[in-house]
Amino acid sequence: YGNVRIFTGSYSSPNMNFRVTTLGTVHQPNQPAFLVRDSNSSSAFGANAYADFDTVILNRGNHYNTSNGRFTAPIAGTYLFISLMLSNGSNRLFHEIRLNGSQVAGTRTESGTGAGQYQSNTTQAILELAKGDWVAIHVGSGGAYGGSYSNFSGYLLG
């Protein structure tokens, strides 16, 4: 322990750029991150389709594409993705996080019978991505409400 040196200053490489303060706080100003949701809370995402979240809350680096619902990794690294979806009334909901079109995580919710029986579910995944890999949310069955009831986020861990 006597030979431990505290690094302060800046570090850059092709895959990361960060600064460490004398207090030990790490700042990554260009770290890819996004949070998106749908613009219409009364609309629903259909079954067997990718969710195309069209309202951007945060899109650092502009790597989330609202036209196709995909986040494309600008650099290789470990990323965290989280999706929260609200079921469409009395329908069940199955939604997946997909990497390059293949399921890597998923959640299924059975709603109650009758109108107004909504359930929410959350799916998350920590993924090792190569530059150019894409991640999107696929609604497998049932349907999901949009608006602030359903969202998708992700960011580079390192």
Language-model segments: what does each one mean?
Residues 2-158:
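Extracellular jelly-roll beta-sandwich "head" domains, especially the C-terminal globular C1q domain
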